[in-house]
Amino acid sequence: MAIKGPRKHLKRLAAPANWQLPRKVKAFTVRPSPGPHSMDKSLPLLLVVRDILKYADNAREAKKIIQTGKILIDGLKRKEYKHPAGLMDVLSIPEMDENYLVLFDESGRISLKKTDKTDAKLCKIVNKTVIKGGHIQLNLHDGRNQIVKVSDATKAEEDVYKTGDSVLVSIPEQSIVGHVAFGEGKLAYITGGKHVGEFAKIVEVENRALYSDIVTLENKDGEKFKTVKPYVFIVGQDEPVISM
């Protein structure tokens, strides 16, 4: 039998392994709504409020809290309990003066890191294209697109943003206010593989034509390791450009 329409339910046993979620308490959990992040790199807001922050004992209480509009993601009110909070999103509760950054812990599980109040977030450029009018469109990891107006997209001095770079996006205005290029010597945050959740400096980049580039990194203990470029998220030069 064919599947007709979008799936609306999710069994706990089928939920992504990196969700911090008891598997055998109940049969079903919340399926995040389609949007800025893939399901394995985000958590629905209800689970954030109930299971991670522990601000509610059950789904009903969590929904009431979310529907008040007191929880912000990237500076915007989110009242939909299925809305996904994903990697590098800034979650704020102004009434309680609490701010969190969505990251992965060293086991690869989605977690919240308490941070200082911030007016910007980091986004990774996953693709880019030249659009009508000759301007450049940057496609970022959290689903947003940013238009960079240029007079000539073929000129290197104007086309400064490359795939794999990171940009600093102001919140809630959602405009680019900073740029950190991908390259040797840059500080990276690892988002997948054996070293997920670690910070390390890029030592070498091996370019490959048909496969993902291989990046050699060195962590704070002096240990060198290799991973693929899609797992490398640039966060700064010597220190992260935001509180992490």
Swiss-Prot record:
GO terms for MF: rRNA binding; structural constituent of ribosome
Gene3D superfamilies per record: 2.30.30.30, 2.40.50.740, RNA-binding S4 domain
Domain of life: Archaea
Cellular component annotations (GO), alphabetically ordered: cytosolic small ribosomal subunit
Gene Ontology process terms (BP): translation
All copies of domain S4 RNA-binding, residue ranges: 43-106
Keywords: Ribonucleoprotein, Ribosomal protein, RNA-binding, rRNA-binding
Segment forming the signal sequence: none
Protein family according to the UniProt entry: Belongs to the eukaryotic ribosomal protein eS4 family.
Protein name as annotated: Small ribosomal subunit protein eS4
Organism: Methanococcus maripaludis (strain C6 / ATCC BAA-1332)
Lineage summary: Archaea, Methanobacteriati, Methanobacteriota, Methanomada group, Methanococci
GN (gene name): rps4e
